[in-house]
């Protein structure tokens, strides 16, 4: 690292350049160019190597951030990748999709006055470069225990659990209903944030480590939980939350109203060459006036996907102001650049339809910000007499997700909470063990919809809980 302790003044924070707007608006490719070697080294050199690094504390997997920044600055890429993988199963993914402004970079000592270290982009650089140079996890010292665990769900929680188990000699077999690993990483997050080759490469790496994947395999249809409990020493549930939350709006089942997740999944499958399904039909927004209801990152994915499909006009409508919007500021900025219109402080009352029963608009009412709610965000209070119509040919509802019905789980004494989430306490003797001692769970199905990195953290901790229970 530099001997100049004021290097953060001499060298300002630099983000990687974005692809030109004319390309971004029509192609499903990652919009950020990767750092060059020189850029990565220089930006890593801005790190102060704080004695108590808040960036590590804020990261859900507690990455050794200053340490691998130092290695990156010195060009020791293999060592940096090795250290990165000690705490994170998917560092090249987190470097792309984590909301660093709310996590590591938001906690960087330099953030307020000098601009945070570009931690996420360096994390991406380290691991992409290491893979390109041939680095792979060293499994030569792993001793097999003879134990095997079935993992249901190849999303971030399931993959993280499989990773840790495999590195400790426990055979992991991962079942997933989709034709590729990743869960919502692959099929929910659009390619302009995470190109799908990233997860294809990951499957090859995991397979080389000894993880076995059984794709296009749905529990309850193609394989039964009874059989998994009989054939394996433990089962981990990393099934996520896929059921879209409804808005309770008049005419929300009208022709032209779509749920966010099926819309995104079908678009990605179409781009990857996979067929559509009855539950997830491909929908094109070409030439349409699109209104997306919601203010989270899923809403941002929907508006930006609609732009790339050729929508005539795209609007994001959110009931609070921009300051209280849950979506990443980076994603909001990108959407604005790509031509999305934002309407804040508007709440939907119902869907307007024409004589043929098709969407013609959204009935809205204006709101103003009131006192904070239980989560600390200011309430949206309706302004009387402010009803109005926003014209639309298509409406996408991005109100969040809840657990889907798992009939195959009911008879196995796995307790659920009032919202349908699996109860699997992190603080139990065996972390993330359910009321059925042979079944563990983690990620969104336990805590509700959350970040990719949080699911990774829970999957890794659940693996420790499984190994503790198996006494390996």
Swiss-Prot record:
This enzyme's EC code(s): 1.4.1.13
Gene Ontology cellular component list: cytosol; glutamate synthase complex (NADPH)
Co-factor requirement: [4Fe-4S] cluster
Keyword set includes NADP: yes
GO molecular function: 4 iron, 4 sulfur cluster binding; glutamate synthase (NADPH) activity; metal ion binding
pH dependence: Optimum pH is 7.6.
Cofactor descriptive note: Binds 1 [4Fe-4S] cluster.
Signal peptide: none
Catalytic activity: 2 L-glutamate + NADP(+) = L-glutamine + 2-oxoglutarate + NADPH + H(+)
Enzyme class, spelled out: oxidoreductase
UniProt-listed Pfam families: Fer4_20, Pyr_redox_2
Job description of the protein: Catalyzes the conversion of L-glutamine and 2-oxoglutarate into two molecules of L-glutamate.
Note: Glutamine binds to the large subunit and transfers the amido group to 2-oxoglutarate that apparently binds to the small subunit.
Subunit comment: Aggregate of 4 catalytic active heterodimers, consisting of a large and a small subunit.
Name of this protein: Glutamate synthase [NADPH] small chain
Species, as recorded: Escherichia coli (strain K12)
């Amino acid at each position: 690292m530099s001997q100049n302790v004021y290097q953060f003044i001499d060298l300002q924070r630099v983000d990687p350049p974005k692809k030109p707007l004319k390309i971004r608006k029509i192609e499903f490719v990652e919009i950020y160019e990767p750092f060059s070697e020189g850029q990565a080294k220089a930006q890593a050199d801005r790190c102060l190597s704080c004695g108590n690094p808040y960036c590590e504390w804020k990261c859900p997997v507690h990455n050794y951030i200053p340490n691998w920044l130092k290695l990156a600055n010195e060009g020791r890429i293999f060592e940096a990748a090795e250290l990165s993988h000690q705490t994170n199963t998917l560092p090249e993914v987190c470097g792309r999709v984590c909301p660093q402004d709310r996590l590591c970079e938001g906690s960087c000592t330099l953030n307020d006055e000098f601009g945070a270290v570009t931690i996420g982009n360096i994390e991406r650089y380290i691991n992409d470069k290491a893979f390109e140079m041939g680095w792979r996890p060293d499994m030569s010292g792993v001793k097999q225990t003879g134990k095997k665990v079935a993992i249901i769900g190849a999303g971030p929680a399931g993959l993280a659990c499989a990773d840790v188990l495999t590195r400790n000699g426990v055979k992991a077999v991962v079942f997933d209903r989709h034709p590729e690993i990743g869960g919502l990483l692959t099929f929910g997050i659009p390619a302009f944030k995470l190109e799908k080759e990233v997860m294809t490469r990951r499957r090859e790496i995991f397979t080389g480590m000894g993880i076995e994947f059984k794709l296009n395999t749905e529990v309850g249809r193609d394989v039964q939980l009874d059989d998994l409990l009989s054939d394996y020493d433990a089962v981990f549930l990393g099934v996520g939350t896929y059921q879209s939350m409804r808005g309770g709006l008049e005419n929300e089942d009208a022709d032209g109203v779509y749920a966010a997740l099926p819309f995104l999944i079908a678009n990605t499958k179409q781009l990857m060459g996979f067929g559509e399904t009855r539950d997830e039909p491909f929908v094109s927004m070409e030439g349409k006036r699109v209104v997306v209801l919601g203010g989270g990152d899923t809403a941002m994915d929907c508006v930006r996907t609609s732009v790339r499909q050729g929508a005539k006009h795209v609007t994001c409508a959110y009931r609070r102001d921009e300051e209280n919007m849950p979506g990443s500021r980076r994603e909001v900025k990108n959407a604005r650049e790509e031509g999305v219109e934002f309407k804040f402080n508007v709440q939907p009352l119902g869907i307007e339809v024409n004589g043929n029963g098709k969407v013609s608009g959204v009935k809205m009412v204006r709101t103003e910000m009131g006192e904070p709610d239980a989560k600390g965000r200011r309430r949206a209070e309706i302004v009387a007499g402010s009803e109005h119509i926003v014209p639309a040919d298509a409406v996408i509802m991005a109100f969040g997700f809840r657990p889907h019905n798992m009939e195959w789980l009911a008879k196995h004494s796995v307790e659920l909470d009032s919202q349908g989430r699996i109860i699997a306490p992190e603080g139990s003797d065996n972390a993330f063990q359910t009321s059925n001692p042979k079944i563990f769970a983690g990620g969104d199905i336990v805590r509700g919809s959350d970040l990719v990195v949080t699911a990774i953290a829970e999957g890794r901790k659940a693996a420790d809980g499984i190994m503790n229970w198996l006494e390996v």
